[in-house]
Amino acid sequence: MVSQSLSYIRIGCTSNAELKALKPALKELRKCMPDIYPMLFLRDYSRLKTMFESGHIDIMLVTKDMIENTDCTFKPIKNMKSYALISDDYNKTTEDNKDLHSMSAISFDDLKGHCLLLLNQRLIPFTQGNLLQEKLVLHSQDNYHFICENSQTSELLAQCGYGIAILPEFCIDSPLDNCRILPITDQREIQYGIAYNKTRSTKDTKKICNILISNLKPQ
Protein backbone atom coordinates (compact mmCIF):
# COMPACT_ATOMS: atom_id res chain seq x y z
CA MET A 1 0.00 0.00 0.00
CA VAL A 2 1.27 3.46 -0.91
CA SER A 3 1.85 5.73 2.08
CA GLN A 4 -0.64 8.58 2.37
CA SER A 5 2.22 10.83 3.48
CA LEU A 6 4.23 10.25 0.30
CA SER A 7 5.77 13.43 -1.08
CA TYR A 8 8.04 14.21 -4.00
CA ILE A 9 11.39 15.82 -4.65
CA ARG A 10 12.03 16.90 -8.25
CA ILE A 11 15.65 16.53 -9.34
CA GLY A 12 17.02 17.76 -12.67
CA CYS A 13 20.24 16.93 -14.52
CA THR A 14 21.65 17.16 -18.03
CA SER A 15 23.28 13.79 -18.76
CA ASN A 16 22.83 10.03 -18.45
CA ALA A 17 26.15 9.85 -16.63
CA GLU A 18 24.65 12.00 -13.86
CA LEU A 19 21.64 9.69 -13.59
CA LYS A 20 23.99 6.75 -13.01
CA ALA A 21 25.96 8.75 -10.46
CA LEU A 22 22.73 9.35 -8.52
CA LYS A 23 22.17 5.65 -7.85
CA PRO A 24 23.97 5.36 -4.46
CA ALA A 25 22.54 8.71 -3.34
CA LEU A 26 18.96 7.69 -4.15
CA LYS A 27 19.42 4.36 -2.38
CA GLU A 28 20.50 6.24 0.74
CA LEU A 29 17.62 8.70 0.34
CA ARG A 30 15.12 5.83 0.30
CA LYS A 31 16.63 4.44 3.52
CA CYS A 32 16.69 7.78 5.35
CA MET A 33 13.47 9.32 4.00
CA PRO A 34 11.25 6.49 2.69
CA ASP A 35 8.23 8.77 2.23
CA ILE A 36 10.11 10.99 -0.23
CA TYR A 37 9.83 9.85 -3.85
CA PRO A 38 12.33 11.27 -6.38
CA MET A 39 11.07 12.54 -9.72
CA LEU A 40 13.99 12.75 -12.16
CA PHE A 41 14.17 15.12 -15.13
CA LEU A 42 16.81 14.78 -17.85
CA ARG A 43 16.82 17.99 -19.90
CA ASP A 44 19.24 20.28 -21.67
CA TYR A 45 20.56 23.15 -19.58
CA SER A 46 18.35 25.86 -21.09
CA ARG A 47 15.14 23.98 -20.34
CA LEU A 48 16.38 22.78 -16.97
CA LYS A 49 17.18 26.32 -15.85
CA THR A 50 13.74 27.52 -16.95
CA MET A 51 12.07 24.71 -14.99
CA PHE A 52 14.21 25.54 -11.95
CA GLU A 53 13.46 29.25 -12.02
CA SER A 54 9.72 28.63 -12.48
CA GLY A 55 9.57 26.18 -9.57
CA HIS A 56 8.99 23.01 -11.61
CA ILE A 57 12.07 21.30 -10.20
CA ASP A 58 13.49 21.57 -6.68
CA ILE A 59 17.13 20.53 -7.09
CA MET A 60 19.59 20.69 -10.00
CA LEU A 61 22.90 18.96 -10.57
CA VAL A 62 24.93 21.78 -12.10
CA THR A 63 28.21 23.59 -12.43
CA LYS A 64 28.48 26.86 -10.57
CA ASP A 65 28.72 28.66 -13.92
CA MET A 66 25.30 27.33 -14.91
CA ILE A 67 23.41 29.02 -12.08
CA GLU A 68 25.30 32.30 -12.00
CA ASN A 69 22.98 35.27 -11.29
CA THR A 70 20.11 33.06 -10.09
CA ASP A 71 18.45 33.16 -6.66
CA CYS A 72 19.65 29.81 -5.38
CA THR A 73 22.01 28.12 -2.98
CA PHE A 74 24.89 26.17 -4.52
CA LYS A 75 26.54 23.29 -2.65
CA PRO A 76 29.80 22.10 -4.26
CA ILE A 77 30.62 18.41 -4.64
CA LYS A 78 33.90 18.45 -6.54
CA ASN A 79 35.99 20.38 -9.05
CA MET A 80 35.79 19.01 -12.57
CA LYS A 81 37.55 19.34 -15.91
CA SER A 82 36.73 18.59 -19.52
CA TYR A 83 38.31 15.66 -21.32
CA ALA A 84 39.17 14.45 -24.81
CA LEU A 85 37.75 11.04 -25.78
CA ILE A 86 39.90 9.22 -28.35
CA SER A 87 39.05 5.82 -29.84
CA ASP A 88 41.72 3.11 -29.87
CA ASP A 89 40.94 2.86 -33.61
CA TYR A 90 41.61 6.57 -34.21
CA ASN A 91 45.00 6.37 -35.92
CA LYS A 92 45.81 10.00 -36.67
CA THR A 93 48.82 11.69 -35.08
CA THR A 94 49.39 15.28 -34.01
CA GLU A 95 50.86 17.80 -36.47
CA ASP A 96 54.31 17.14 -35.02
CA ASN A 97 53.74 13.34 -35.33
CA LYS A 98 53.14 12.59 -31.66
CA ASP A 99 51.05 9.46 -31.05
CA LEU A 100 47.80 10.52 -29.36
CA HIS A 101 47.49 7.13 -27.66
CA SER A 102 50.80 7.51 -25.83
CA MET A 103 49.85 10.84 -24.25
CA SER A 104 48.66 11.28 -20.66
CA ALA A 105 47.15 14.73 -21.34
CA ILE A 106 46.36 16.75 -24.46
CA SER A 107 46.51 20.42 -25.45
CA PHE A 108 44.75 22.37 -28.19
CA ASP A 109 48.03 22.53 -30.08
CA ASP A 110 47.89 18.72 -30.18
CA LEU A 111 44.32 18.90 -31.51
CA LYS A 112 45.16 21.00 -34.57
CA GLY A 113 43.99 19.28 -37.75
CA HIS A 114 41.58 16.98 -35.93
CA CYS A 115 37.80 16.94 -36.15
CA LEU A 116 36.29 17.73 -32.75
CA LEU A 117 32.93 16.36 -31.61
CA LEU A 118 31.40 19.11 -29.46
CA LEU A 119 28.20 19.40 -27.46
CA ASN A 120 25.64 22.05 -28.32
CA GLN A 121 26.39 24.98 -26.01
CA ARG A 122 22.90 24.91 -24.54
CA LEU A 123 23.93 21.62 -22.90
CA ILE A 124 27.15 22.96 -21.33
CA PRO A 125 26.97 26.76 -21.17
CA PHE A 126 30.13 28.69 -20.36
CA THR A 127 30.56 32.04 -18.70
CA GLN A 128 32.28 34.82 -20.57
CA GLY A 129 36.06 34.51 -20.34
CA ASN A 130 36.08 30.71 -20.05
CA LEU A 131 39.47 29.59 -21.40
CA LEU A 132 38.25 26.26 -22.76
CA GLN A 133 35.41 27.88 -24.69
CA GLU A 134 37.81 30.45 -26.14
CA LYS A 135 40.12 27.65 -27.29
CA LEU A 136 37.20 25.75 -28.87
CA VAL A 137 36.12 28.86 -30.79
CA LEU A 138 39.67 29.42 -32.09
CA HIS A 139 40.02 25.75 -33.06
CA SER A 140 36.73 25.80 -35.00
CA GLN A 141 37.94 28.69 -37.16
CA ASP A 142 40.61 26.55 -38.83
CA ASN A 143 39.46 22.97 -38.21
CA TYR A 144 36.37 20.89 -38.89
CA HIS A 145 34.07 20.23 -35.96
CA PHE A 146 30.71 18.54 -35.46
CA ILE A 147 28.02 19.69 -33.01
CA CYS A 148 26.27 16.85 -31.15
CA GLU A 149 22.84 17.16 -29.56
CA ASN A 150 23.64 14.90 -26.60
CA SER A 151 26.65 13.36 -24.88
CA GLN A 152 25.76 9.80 -25.98
CA THR A 153 26.03 10.82 -29.65
CA SER A 154 29.38 12.47 -29.01
CA GLU A 155 30.70 9.39 -27.20
CA LEU A 156 29.41 7.04 -29.92
CA LEU A 157 30.99 9.00 -32.77
CA ALA A 158 34.27 9.20 -30.87
CA GLN A 159 34.24 5.43 -30.25
CA CYS A 160 33.65 4.87 -33.98
CA GLY A 161 36.66 7.03 -34.88
CA TYR A 162 34.87 10.00 -36.47
CA GLY A 163 36.82 12.48 -34.38
CA ILE A 164 37.81 13.46 -30.86
CA ALA A 165 34.99 14.21 -28.44
CA ILE A 166 35.40 17.08 -25.96
CA LEU A 167 33.15 16.57 -22.95
CA PRO A 168 32.89 17.88 -19.39
CA GLU A 169 33.52 15.22 -16.78
CA PHE A 170 29.90 15.11 -15.61
CA CYS A 171 28.78 14.08 -19.11
CA ILE A 172 31.18 11.16 -19.59
CA ASP A 173 29.63 7.72 -19.19
CA SER A 174 32.82 6.12 -17.89
CA PRO A 175 34.30 3.61 -18.52
CA LEU A 176 34.02 3.59 -22.31
CA ASP A 177 34.98 0.58 -24.43
CA ASN A 178 37.97 1.04 -26.75
CA CYS A 179 38.36 4.69 -25.83
CA ARG A 180 41.00 6.74 -24.00
CA ILE A 181 39.92 9.66 -21.81
CA LEU A 182 42.60 12.36 -21.63
CA PRO A 183 42.51 15.57 -19.57
CA ILE A 184 42.80 18.80 -21.55
CA THR A 185 45.57 21.10 -20.35
CA ASP A 186 44.16 24.42 -21.63
CA GLN A 187 41.38 24.98 -19.10
CA ARG A 188 40.47 25.84 -15.56
CA GLU A 189 38.58 23.52 -13.23
CA ILE A 190 34.87 24.18 -12.74
CA GLN A 191 32.87 23.72 -9.56
CA TYR A 192 30.21 21.02 -9.82
CA GLY A 193 27.48 20.44 -7.26
CA ILE A 194 23.83 20.82 -6.30
CA ALA A 195 21.63 23.91 -6.42
CA TYR A 196 18.29 24.58 -4.78
CA ASN A 197 16.09 27.67 -4.63
CA LYS A 198 16.62 29.83 -1.54
CA THR A 199 13.05 31.03 -1.16
CA ARG A 200 11.20 27.79 -1.98
CA SER A 201 13.40 25.37 -0.05
CA THR A 202 12.19 23.51 3.06
CA LYS A 203 13.96 21.60 5.81
CA ASP A 204 13.34 18.44 3.78
CA THR A 205 14.94 20.01 0.70
CA LYS A 206 18.09 20.86 2.64
CA LYS A 207 18.21 17.42 4.26
CA ILE A 208 17.81 15.74 0.86
CA CYS A 209 20.61 17.91 -0.56
CA ASN A 210 22.92 16.83 2.25
CA ILE A 211 22.13 13.16 1.55
CA LEU A 212 22.78 13.63 -2.16
CA ILE A 213 26.05 15.50 -1.59
CA SER A 214 27.32 12.83 0.81
CA ASN A 215 26.48 9.93 -1.50
CA LEU A 216 26.62 11.25 -5.05
CA LYS A 217 29.37 9.46 -6.96
CA PRO A 218 30.29 11.39 -10.11
CA GLN A 219 32.16 9.38 -12.74
Which residues does each PLM region occupy?
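Secondary-structure junction motif
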Residues: S104-F108, K112-H139
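A late-sequence structural motif
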Residues: A21, R180-Q219
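N-terminal winged-helix
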Residues: V2-T50, S201, T205-K206
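Short beta-strand-to-loop elements that line the ligand-binding cleft
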Residues: Y37-D44, S140-N150
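Flexible hinge/capping segments at coil-to-helix
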Residues: S3, T73-L116, K206
